[in-house]
Amino acid sequence: MANFTAADVKALREQTGAGMMDVKKALTEADGDAEKALEIIRLKGLKSLSKREGRQASAGLLAAQTDGTVGVLVEVNSETDFVAKNQKFIDFSNEVLAAAVASGAADLDALLAAPMGEGTVKDRLDAFAAVIGEKLQIGRIVRVEGENVDLYLHQTNPDLPPQVGVFVVTDAAGKSVAHDIAMHVAAYMPAYLDRDSVPADVLDKERATLEKITLEEGKPANIVPKIVEGRLNAFYKDNCLVDQAYARDPSKSVGQILKEAGATVTNFVRVHVGA
């Protein structure tokens, strides 16, 4: 007869996030001792870590915060959405974020080495992965600073934690519009801030492609440059934040909205889980 109850199974599942059968086996092996069962689950998980290294951890969530002048975001990945929406995984991700903020880490190596509990973020990540039973990883860390840093987190699926995160950095005058612009960035996915931000090689490639298309259409060679420049404007409107039609009022560009507010966007970052 088992030396544990359904309540014991439920409590250990809530503590570890492990499956019901794994918890029952551990409690049976531990003769009902919850502490021993917890250690059994942890050790079995650690032994299987190497087997999971080749798996893809492309699900997960974003945890982020801003104090108004500094924004920090971490992407924590799991193999499945089932784990991503687990409250223990969410809590763990928020602890990773707290470690990132406290340590001032600005890159992945620094974050993994940052103090967390009695060890490092890497130590806690491996231990938690052993209990959860999936490959877990820290996908990235983003740290931005500026006069005004606004944050928007978006759930692409109402059943899952945030999958898209945006930081928008503005001058002081931009506080009134920064959050709406962050929401715009989440939806419209601009690649660049403005025309000057487009790398020369990207622009050269786009111009060459447009020239080829225009010539193949049989346009007179003497007007091809003018047509190409017109088509480049369409490229800018699709890819540059300040040139895009504003989500809340498509009759105006984001640049016009900023001008009306007397504001300037100096930087933005858009992150999507797994991308």
Regions found by a protein language model. Give the residues of each.
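N-terminal assembly/interaction segments in proteins that build large macromolecular machines
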Residues: A2-A275
